[in-house]
């Protein structure tokens, strides 16, 4: 029989219910988490046995949104969900990051977490719900796990922190921050901010961590009531004798290798040491396992690097703890792009371009929470050659999507509003070299490329990655970390912002015990590094170019009467299609009558504006126009008088005398002067040739509103 167990609690302004025992009973554990009608079903399956030869922890997190959750049918050809979208990939990473460091060292059993959004309230984002569910299933499962974790979203509205703001509240928030951690420590932060101070950001992290304790308490209570028995798992004991033999052969040599400042040379030397030591030990004793030797060598590498840092010795590349690597900043490096920059920091390099497009180039994103349009795109590419490797090239992987989103968060706060700069902007960061913090190099490069393209960003922005090495109460915060320092350290702390404050903060912590003091030191040290980088960037370009590239489309804006929109578009879009083909421009019309004409050639834009003005011009009764005969019928002739308007000259209005046959007086294509007699309620125009007397000013085209570029 089904025996559901439910735990309900208040979480800020929302009510959360966690239910288990009802569904997916063959999974290791399963829960349904409901937060004010946003429901996510989360399962975990852990394999009891380790695959032979497994040398890493195979944790997989799948997050999937079902359109039925929002009462919709998928819009794809097959009418079913396909591969995960970018948003789903980002949420999967959000779930993964705080969970992964809580599995014990040496645990290599395969674990898969699947979170499925099955109901959605547009005001409650399912990401926090999914994170709570993932924490709950692991706590219930009995799988070795040092959790549970909580998760909270923090907004900053009217100078107040807001817990789990609704979608509407977030629109007025200067901050969108997600924080996750255990009862005693923050483990993960992901945020986007509207240039907040270090103190405001740190306060948000602390606030979110304090508020999520209620989640942790309730998950613990549910696990006590319904949790499965803990797995009888113990880590493999360390082979101290083998460890000592490996250390004797390799530790000093690895120490020397880690004094080589050039990355590829250092890696080659480290690999050679590992191969020689492994071969020597296997020659002495064939019963030894190569994987175990490699694991010990890895721990020795970590010990060498970390102990030096903690003793205050120079880092791998000879820098002090708060030094930034050498910078090289160049703009305008590509001749035909709209904006470009090459940003180099040590052995990390990004070639970044900015491209300006029209509104129709904006990305329409159909999400479960609703459809939205994105006018600012930032794409990050990490080819294998950037780290001296070969590999598959293809669609972006999870890491590239995540790094691109972080870089975008860093730049978004300074982007101009649509009414200030009516362009769609796409930034692409090509990582050409990588040795630490390529996402932050992308922020710097994006800022430079945007200014080179003439995009009026509010301020230059830069990013920096901070690291941490901590043993007991001894700790050192490192500025501008290398790839090795990221891998061998305890924290990856990325901060982007302007001279005034922070625009993005991402933090991933591998250990517990990170205090507010450590985070404060890291933020302050990051500020100094950020200001240094900005000062170097300013020497290359200190403000946006005064004009956009000659190769970029120029957008000219005019206003027409909204009632005339249908005339410009035409039946089935016939008129606007003909206009774009005739003028070689791109034309977009908004509901309020705003017309945007984009063209790389000024003359083409003027031609398009002129034609639109003709079409939308108002015809005045009693005014005389010059028109062309378009059709002849028995009862008169139709005359086009500009602006796509056509009127009828009745046979009685052609001449002062009786007209028997219209064709005796008029021919198709003939230019004639006509006077507007009347415009009836249906918009039909009555014209007269005989009343178009000499001496009255003739209008070739109707009067139309002036354009504004």
From Swiss-Prot:
Its EC number is 2.7.7.8. InterPro entries: ExoRNase_PH_dom1, ExoRNase_PH_dom2, ExoRNase_PH_dom2_sf, KH_dom, KH_dom_type_1, KH_dom_type_1_sf, NA-bd_OB-fold, PNPase. Keywords: Cytoplasm, Magnesium, Metal-binding, Nucleotidyltransferase, RNA-binding, Transferase. Residues 622-690 form the S1 motif domain. Transmembrane segments: none annotated. Residues 553-612 form the KH domain. PROSITE patterns: KH_TYPE_1, S1. GO terms for biological process: mRNA catabolic process; RNA processing. Pfam families: KH_1, PNPase, RNase_PH, RNase_PH_C, S1. Its cofactor is Mg(2+). Belongs to the polyribonucleotide nucleotidyltransferase family. Involved in mRNA degradation. Catalyzes the phosphorolysis of single-stranded polyribonucleotides processively in the 3'- to 5'-direction. This is Polyribonucleotide nucleotidyltransferase. The gene is pnp.
């Amino acid at each position: 029989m089904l025996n559901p167990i439910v735990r309900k609690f208040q979480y800020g302004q929302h009510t959360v219910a966690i239910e288990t025992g009802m569904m997916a009973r063959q999974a290791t554990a399963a829960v349904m988490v409901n937060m004010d009608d946003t429901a996510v079903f989360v399962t975990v399956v852990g394999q009891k046995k380790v695959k032979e030869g497994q040398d890493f922890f195979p944790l997989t997190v799948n997050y999937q949104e079902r359109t039925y959750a929002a009462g919709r049918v998928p819009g794809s050809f097959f009418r079913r969900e396909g591969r995960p979208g970018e948003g789903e990939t980002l949420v999967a990473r959000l779930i993964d990051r705080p969970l992964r460091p809580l599995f014990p060292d040496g645990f290599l059993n395969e674990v898969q977490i699947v979170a499925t959004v099955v109901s959605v309230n547009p005001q409650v984002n399912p990401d926090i719900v999914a994170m709570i569910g993932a924490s709950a299933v692991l706590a219930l499962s009995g799988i070795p796990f040092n959790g549970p974790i909580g998760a909270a979203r923090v907004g900053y509205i009217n100078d107040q922190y807001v817990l789990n703001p609704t979608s509407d509240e977030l629109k007025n928030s200067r901050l969108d921050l997600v924080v996750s951690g255990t009862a005693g420590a923050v483990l993960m932060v992901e945020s986007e901010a509207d240039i907040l101070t270090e103190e405001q950001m740190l306060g948000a992290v602390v606030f979110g961590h304090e508020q999520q304790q209620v989640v942790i308490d309730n998950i613990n209570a549910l696990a006590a009531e319904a949790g499965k028995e803990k797995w009888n798992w113990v880590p493999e004991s360390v082979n101290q004798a083998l460890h000592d033999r490996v250390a004797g052969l390799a530790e000093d040599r690895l120490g020397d290798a880690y004094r080589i400042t050039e990355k590829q040379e250092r890696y080659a030397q480290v690999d050679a040491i590992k191969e020689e030591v492994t071969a020597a030990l296997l020659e002495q004793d064939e019963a030894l396992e190569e994987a175990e030797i490699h694991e010990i060598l890895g721990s020795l590498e970590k010990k060498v690097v970390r102990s030096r840092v903690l003793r205050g010795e120079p880092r791998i590349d000879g820098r002090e703890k708060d030094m930034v690597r050498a910078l090289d900043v160049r703009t305008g490096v590509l001749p035909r792009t709209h904006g470009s920059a090459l940003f180099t920091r040590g052995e990390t390099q990004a070639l970044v371009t900015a491209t300006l497009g029209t509104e129709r180039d904006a990305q329409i994103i159909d999400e479960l929470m609703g459809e939205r349009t994105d006018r600012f795109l930032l794409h990050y590419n990490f080819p294998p050659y950037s780290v001296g490797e070969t590999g598959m090239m293809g669609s972006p992987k999870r890491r590239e999507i995540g790094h691109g989103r972080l870089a975008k968060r860093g730049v978004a706060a300074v982007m101009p509003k649509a009414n200030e700069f009516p362009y769609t902007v796409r930034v692409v960061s090509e990582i050409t070299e990588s040795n630490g913090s390529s996402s932050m190099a992308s922020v710097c490069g994006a800022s430079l490329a945007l200014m080179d393209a003439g995009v009026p960003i509010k301020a230059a922005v830069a990013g920096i990655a901070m690291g941490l090495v901590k043993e007991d109460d001894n700790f050192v915060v490192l500025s501008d970390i290398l790839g090795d320092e990221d891998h061998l350290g305890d924290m990856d702390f990325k901060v982007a912002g302007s001279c005034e404050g922070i625009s993005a903060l991402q933090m991933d912590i591998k250990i517990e015990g990170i205090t507010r003091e450590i985070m404060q030191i890291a933020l302050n040290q990051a500020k100094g590094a950020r200001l240094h980088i900005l000062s170097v960037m300013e020497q290359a370009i200190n403000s946006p170019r005064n004009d956009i590239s000659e190769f970029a489309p120029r957008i000219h804006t005019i206003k027409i009467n909204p009632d005339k929109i249908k005339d410009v578009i035409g039946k089935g879009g016939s008129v606007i299609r003909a206009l774009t083909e005739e003028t070689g421009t791109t034309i977009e019309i908004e509901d309020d009558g705003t017309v945007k004409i984009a063209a790389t050639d000024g003359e083409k834009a003027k031609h398009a504006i002129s034609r639109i003005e003709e079409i939308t011009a108002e015809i005045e009764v009693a005014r005389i126009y010059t028109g062309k005969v378009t059709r002849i019928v028995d009862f008169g002739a139709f005359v086009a008088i500009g602006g796509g308007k056509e009127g009828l000259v009745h046979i009685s209005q052609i001449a002062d005398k009786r007209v028997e046959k219209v064709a005796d007086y008029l021919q198709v294509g003939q230019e004639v002067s006509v006077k507007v007699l009347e415009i009836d309620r249906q918009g039909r125009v009555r014209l007269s040739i005989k009343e178009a007397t000499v001496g009255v000013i003739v209008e070739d085209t109707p009067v139309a509103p002036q354009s504004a570029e």
